Amino acid sequence: MLVGGMPQAVESYIETNNFRKVDEIKRDILKLYEDDFRKIDTSGRISMLFDAIPAQLNTNASRYQVSGVLSGERADTVLELISDMVDSRTVQIAYQANDPNVGLANAKDLRRFKLFLADTGLLATLIFKDKDFTENIIYEKLLSDKLGVDLGYVYENIVAQILSAKGHALYYHTFLNEKSKHNYEIDFLLSKKNKICPIEVKSSGYNTHKALDAFSEKFSERILEKYLVYTKDLKKDGDILMLPVYLLPFMK
């Protein structure tokens, strides 16, 4: 997760075992991304949308808030820019599925989406892009298994990366908790055997799954399997498979 999958970064880590040198390489890669974005869009809007991904994920909002990054713009006014970013394969996009069912593509809301970096190692560097490596607390926290809720979106990004690498289009679902008037969110939805599989992601060992439970109650007849991806051991909790994040690539 820290090094990522970029060949230069992986090679540097194997040769030096030095995260600082790896981070320098990843900063160079991000600079190349910025240069390419400027060629695609000389106004710099793509660069701004890209740089804001960590902040947008950190808000826990139900969508990427375009207006918070580009004044006067909305999601439906930057669809072409978003498409250019996705085509560059530097980011992954997850769409809100308004009516989660087997045909997720038919339920996607083009105006409600989240953006993830295609490489989580680059995300770890982008978060602290404007600071010195010594101020990048993600390395220390991940190595000591103390990544807090405030950086939980790093795990959400790695899940997005893994699912995308397995060939899945990315969807999520947000719905209202009628009692608290706050939103529940299913982080990812998969389509399988004419059913859907909801996935909730936890950045810690906590095995509570309120969103999964509420989703199951609402859409029980549509669900095939339920997953909670977290940092502890493989186990079952009723009909929910508690899956360590490192086993996610092997999920069938």
Which sequence ranges carry the predicted segments?
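Phosphate-coordinating catalytic segments in nucleotide- and nucleic-acid-processing enzymes
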Residues: 39, 59-60, 75-76, 92-96
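Generic recognition of short, well-ordered alpha-helical interface segments
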Residues: 1, 21-25, 41-44, 80, ...
